Amino acid sequence: MSTSIRICSYLLLPLIYLLVNVKIAQLGESFPITIVTFLPVLLLLFLERISVKKLMIALGIGAGLTAFNYLFGQSLDASKYVTSTMLFVYIVIIIGMVWSIRFKTISPHNHRKILRFFYLVVGLVVALAAVEMAQIILTGGSSIMESISKYLIYSNSYVLNFIKFGGKRTTALYFEPAFFALALISIWLSIKQFGIKTPKTDAMILAGIILSGSFSGVMTFILFYLLEWAFQYLNKEAIKKKLPLALISLAVFLVGVVIAFPYISTRLGDLGTEGSSSYYRIVGPLVMVGYSLTHIDGVVRFGSLYEYVASFGIFNGADVGKTIDNGLYLLIIYFSWFAVFLSLWYMGKVIKMMINAFGDNRNFRVQLYLFTPVSLFFTGSIFSPEYAFLIVCPFILRKALNITR
């Protein structure tokens, strides 16, 4: 493949961020088709070599988890089993391909072109979110958001209803605020793989996350930035040479936290308020998780989630919820202790990485690997190509930039 074609192929990645939630077509009631539905094919554009061994390992793990779920999970709605299983297998294929592929290298003189496209995407979505927020403040509603939602994979009617009752959330080109924030953080990590400082873009991305109203997004951005401060300045060499800069940057960070404290404290308080989104995402489902870990019939077969969740009668707003908005809890409900052990194993790897990152966290390596488990707390729609793209895109760029550590 020629260099020019290769450049165009990688420029698809920032473009996909704009279109990731735009529905092209629909198969049945629960299978929207988007550009990332074809992600396995798109990955072939970047393919230089593939490790069949790694791919087989990934597919084998996926097959084992699927078999466990089928054998031990209780079926409450057999009609949705095939579709739900296909989605899980599809995600395994995408992750397996990204892990096993050696991507074509992006040459240094093309970095700026790709970065410009990412900057353009950030500018467009944050500007749109700002316009949506302005309309919400001025009119109490958002006809812009309502118009855009007609072209998205899922309706954001619950967000519009929330706004009618005085809430302030934006979604830009995405189907919900949490996914919007997740997309911005994914873009941010993609940009960071190029190893340059982008304070203006960082500020714009933070502004977009705040406009989304996603508490998970705000806290994740704060966590990742605080980690980077620690990795840069909490080592002997940096303390000797950069102490004033470290203190200034920490002071700026603390000022930001103080300004955001009323919002943070309010959202933390919501964790104890039944019916709030924070309660429904974190606290309410714990009873389901506990049941899945302590009862033989606690594992739910693919496709039966709605009925299982509804049986616990946990309120999401004024209605009984039927979905799980927490990916980690979803994995436990489907795979029980396997999900717990795999999560602990992965976090052990990340913690070991953190210990060795002080003074040497090349291109936000720790934050990139931490992003996968943290992202589980943003959404329950983790068995979707759209979610998978947000997770794997920064890894694709890291491998294409030949960052080995």
From Swiss-Prot:
GO terms for cellular component: plasma membrane. It is found in: Cell inner membrane. Keywords: Cell inner membrane, Cell membrane, Lipopolysaccharide biosynthesis, Membrane, Transmembrane, Transmembrane helix. The keyword Transmembrane applies. It is a multi-pass membrane protein. This is Putative colanic acid polymerase. The gene is wcaD. Its main location: membrane. NCBIfam families: WcaD. It comes from Escherichia coli (strain K12). Pathway: Slime biogenesis; slime polysaccharide biosynthesis. The chain crosses the membrane at residues 5-25, 27-47, 55-75, 81-101, 117-137, 171-191, 204-224, 244-264, 282-302, 327-347, 376-396. GO terms for biological process: colanic acid metabolic process; lipopolysaccharide biosynthetic process; slime layer polysaccharide biosynthetic process. InterPro entries: Colanic_acid_synth_WcaD (IPR024013). The keyword Metal-binding does not apply.
